[in-house]
Amino acid sequence: MSKIRIYEYAKQNNLASKDVINFLKTENVEVSNHMSAISDEVVKKLDNKFKAKPENAKKGQNQKQSNNQQQNRQKQNQKNQSKPNKNKKQKGPKKNQQQERPAAKPAETPGKITYHGTLTVQDLAGKLNKEPAELIKKLMFLGVMATKNQDIDDDAIELICGEYDVEVEKEIILEDTDLDKYIEEDAEENLQERPAVVTIMGHVDHGKTTLLDSIRHTKVTAGEAGGITQHIGAYQVENDGKKITFLDTPGHAAFTSMRSRGAQVTDIAILVVAADDGVMPQTVEAINHAKAAEVPIIVAVNKMDKEGANPDRVMQELTEHQLIPEDWGGNTIFVNLSAIKNEGIDDLLEMILLVSEVEELKANPNAKAFGSVIDAQLDKGRGSVATLLVQNGTLHVGDPLVVGSTFGKVRAMVNDLGNRVTEVGPSTPVEITGLHGVPQAGDQFLVFKDEKKARQIGEAREQKQIDENRGTQSTVSLDDLFEQIKQGEMKELNIIVKADVQGSVEALAASLQKIEVEGVNVKIIHTGVGAITESDIILASASKAIVIGFNVRPDVNAKNAAESEKVDLRLHRVIYNAIEEIESAMKGLLDPEYQEKVIGQAEVREIFKVSRIGTIAGSYVTDGKITRDAGVRLIRDGVVLYEGELQALKRFKDDVKEVQTNYECGITISNFNDIKEGDTIEAFVMEEIERK
């Protein structure tokens, strides 16, 4: 039987909820209020206490009722004979109800239900063996008003099932082009231990490359002449008889671009931090990328051979990013090493093996091969060449496979040592040829039994991608933010904050996190000081985030990446404006307004100081055009120093209205003379735009 609440029991037995609660407390039954649920055993205790007296009272009442019935029976006898059906209808149901109540057992509530699409209240009631009215009542308690034929959302279904301690699972119907549909689940007994896949990340000059080289040259499989003869973006080393696979990804951008395509190839991230330098901006960036991928982090404190090495300082700085050493009560492993002197390399490899053992990394080597693309290119002699990482199963020469939106048959395989191989197992990188097209890094691949099926699915996936590219890309933009919130598509708004100084970053991030509209929270996934970079844009694209710049500008690569990835870039000079814009967008209050459009950039190549005029910047227009009526800002090292108006724009000695790309000009900025060679002057106009 299902549990009932105290107020329901009290109502059924004409009792006060308070009396029931007081009695249960004397019996040491923990209840908080009239809404508390009680078990069958507790119900029996209550019956023994409260039902004895009512039954005696009922006997007296029944006797009086029976006497009255006998007196009236003779009077009603004629009516009963003349109208038998009517009386049967009246008495029948009451009699049946009294007889059937103890006999009829309610259907048991299932332990688990599954569904796909949506459910109406009536459908859910049928699955739970409950009355729709009972579910409608519970939905009302949850603040959801619904009729029995009305669809209810997934959250409401989960809450209702939670009330009955029923596990709920939503079935996802896969399309024929989804590779997940063809991946078979492996039985536990078929799984075997596999090597860990490790990515090394960190600041640009903290010794990532040196560490990779040290591991590569000291731990290459013994007996291989010439060591690594070919670099394929990944390699394996052996330590204590166990293999470890290292991915040589070119920076954090590639790491995240792979993740954005659904590839979760990394098992462990190694964060390299220089002992003499501490945590740097790219270190923080690497931490955020690794956390977003939800992989364990091992901190490698490098350059311990230097005089200024201070590992304690590194530990202290990393605690601010929730990486707390084991010695300080945390769960992050720290390894001190010197990559250039090959000191501590064995300790690092030992820790990697320890973490991989804890993570229980397993795969089925006998399954059809499945994995991800590490890198791919078009070679003049060999055609399409792709570096694959086998994540499950074994890949053989001659296997037909689908890779991303292309397909083919494995013609040849070369391992990380440059040797031709005929088969490779789980967690092994290999370079293959034989594909019809060039896949992208992060694409998934799967081996099929026959080439015809692989071709059919590969062509269908290619057509699907073409159709998707014609449509709009699913990204987050302030323009349609309110619409997404209204449709329930968003519960969290991801934001990346970049500013000119750390104080501004912290102030802006703190203010943005306080905004909450319609149950949508603001989540700051990355902050940093300095110009907006391409890496920021790729992280934003992978995480569906908006980038906010305060007193900083995007570099050329970042600007191009933002356009191609359709990432929303918002640049501000007043913190309040940034906060107001986000809050207004979330509330759906963005009215048509003016938006800045950058029309050109000029590089300052020479400075002329004239007493009556001020500083004249001899400039060369590198992009777009500079117009006389445009607003300008002076940028130095990616940071905006001044924003104002042009005082004069000249070509030789003549005043001009505009100067095009690849032409020189003289620029004077109103009320500003602190101009230096190498500065960038950016021209912009304000255009009226209408919010969609």
Curated annotation (Swiss-Prot):
Chain spans, region G3: 248-251
Top-level taxon of origin: Bacteria
GO molecular-function terms, A-Z: GTP binding; GTPase activity; translation initiation factor activity
Stretches with biased composition (Low complexity): 59-84
Region (G2): 227-231
Residue span of region G5: 338-340
GO cellular component: cytosol
Span of domain tr-type G: 193-362
Residue span of region G1: 202-209
TM ranges: none
Subcellular locations according to the entry: Cytoplasm
Positions bound to GTP: 202-209, 248-252, 302-305
Record's compositionally biased regions (Basic residues): 85-94
Name this polypeptide is given: Translation initiation factor IF-2
Organism field: Oceanobacillus iheyensis (strain DSM 14371 / CIP 107618 / JCM 11309 / KCTC 3954 / HTE831)
